[in-house]
Amino acid sequence: LQRGRALKSCSIRVSSHRRYGFFIYSPMIFYFSGTGNSEWIANQLSKGQNEDLVFIPEALKNEALEFDLQKDEKIGFVFPIYSWAPPEIVLRFINRISLKEYQNQYLFFVCSCGDDTGLTQQVLVKALNDKGWLCHAGFSVTMPNNYVLLPGFDVDTKELERIKLANAVPRLTEINALISRREKIFSCHEGSLPFLKTRIINPLFNRFQMS
């Protein structure tokens, strides 16, 4: 599995004060990317929504875990699918961050997947609900399979990669428009046998990766 190559530094807006030993940042789109697909998605959303980006590993490393919300802000999470679920680092980040002045602001997620998402929507919505936050929208974007996840899987052919990238552009245009209108909609491709993939295979995958 190829993960975690160095990405470009993200733009972070910082307020002029501290609380409880942590910087408090203005809200933006939080993202994690392992091979670059989700970074590209995050950049397209950042341009479309005029929101800054926060690279999740960098925020965790710097203990930048408190974020100031404005009344009409939009809050986004962008990440790849790892074995039909959000990456553990994304769930850990959600568990640790604090959103100051949260008042049911519009919250969405966009995930990149090679083929399908399994029950990713359920997993992420529950993680947000556990923090007292309501998820209003969620989307999946099919991107090239450019890493080997499990035995029996392979990267996409160059032709399939080209087709996926071509289709991703109008898909992001559509998603940006829906988010701009603050639509309450979920459009994730679960695929076949989502329970098996997310609830059984994913825990085994995570255990294998940590062993």
Question: Would you name each region that the model predicts?
Answer:
Residues 25-29, 35-40, 44-60, 69-208:
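FMN-binding flavodoxin-like domain, especially the glycine-rich phosphate-binding loop
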Residues 2, 17-20, 25:
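Low-complexity, intrinsically disordered or signal/transmembrane-proximal segments
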Residues 211:
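Cysteine-centered iron-sulfur cluster-binding motifs in ferredoxin-type domains/subunits
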Residues 63-65:
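Short acidic active-site motifs
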